[in-house]
Amino acid sequence: MSPVRRGETLPIYNRIAVLRAEHRLSRAALAEAVNVNMQTIGALERGDHYPSLDLAMRICDVFGLPIEAVFARTEFTPLSAEVYPSSKGKP
């Protein structure tokens, strides 16, 4: 089974695009840092491709973060929801 097919039932979400923006890295710069094509970074960000464990670890090393901070099986909470919690039902 291909990784994308497995991903239909077990998705892998990531924060690569957000982290790239925070670190002011282009797709090309991140691709060069982890030794892959720029198109691979785009496919990862869109969820069209899932990284090997080795690639996931190389990406995490670039950002200095543990793997669970960059990749997860459940969707990440939007940063805006963490920074600006909903005030519904509050006076």
Across the structure, where does each feature detected by a protein language model lie?
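Residue-level detection of the helix-turn-helix DNA-binding "recognition helix"
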Residues: A21, N35, R46, E75
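Short alpha-helical DNA-recognition segment
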Residues: R24-A43
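The DNA-contacting recognition helix of HTH DNA-binding domains
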Residues: R27, M38, D48-H49, I67
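Alpha-helical residues within the helix-turn-helix
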Residues: A21, E32, D61
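Short, charged recognition helix plus adjacent turn
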Residues: S2, R6, D61, F71-P91
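A short, Lys/Arg-rich alpha-helix, primarily the initiator
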Residues: M1-E22
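Generic structural marker for isolated residues within well-ordered, non-membrane alpha-helices
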Residues: I16, R27, A56
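DNA major-groove recognition helix of helix-turn-helix/homeodomain DNA-binding modules
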Residues: D54-A69
